[in-house]
């Protein structure tokens, strides 16, 4: 019995050490996130204000501000269904159905260093919301950041 307790303790210790060694690889600084956005999208500085507005609006259930950050039309996945949102007013009128309380809380707590960035855009709240740089012209010389995906 003493031998098996020692073996279990040793195995548990090895697992803890393994996770401790891996954990820092997932941590990233604000600067690393900024650099990744800049590398993939080229306009990291322009994300700051829309992102802050989104986080604050989710905290305060400000449907109008969130609606103004969306690129329309937008397909929203919520409550096991898909909704095609055509306008700001459509979004505001259906806000409580389209954005769950859980998503509002998660986005409202979003930290910049916890953003996930890939070529599709910037993911918030484990994929509940995505923002992307949306081209304003054919050459994509001008773009703006907008909500492009909502998955509750």
Each PLM stretch: what is its role?
Residues 23-27:
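Sec/Tat signal peptide C-region and signal peptidase I cleavage site
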Residues 1-13:
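Bacterial N-terminal signal peptides that target proteins for export
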């Amino acid at each position: 019995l003493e031998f098996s307790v020692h073996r279990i303790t040793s195995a548990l210790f090895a697992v803890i050490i393994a996770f401790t060694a891996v954990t820092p690889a997932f941590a990233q600084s604000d600067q690393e996130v900024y650099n990744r956005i800049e590398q993939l999208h080229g306009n990291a500085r322009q994300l700051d204000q829309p992102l802050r507005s989104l986080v604050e609006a989710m905290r305060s259930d400000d449907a109008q501000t969130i609606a103004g950050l969306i690129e329309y039309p937008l397909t929203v996945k919520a409550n096991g269904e898909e909704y095609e949102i055509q306008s700001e007013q459509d979004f505001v009128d259906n806000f409580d159905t389209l954005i769950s309380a859980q998503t509002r809380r998660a986005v409202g707590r979003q930290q910049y260093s916890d953003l996930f960035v890939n070529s599709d855009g910037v993911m918030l709240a484990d994929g509940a919301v995505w923002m992307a740089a949306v081209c304003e012209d054919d050459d994509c010389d001008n773009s703006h950041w907008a909500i492009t995906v909502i998955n509750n």
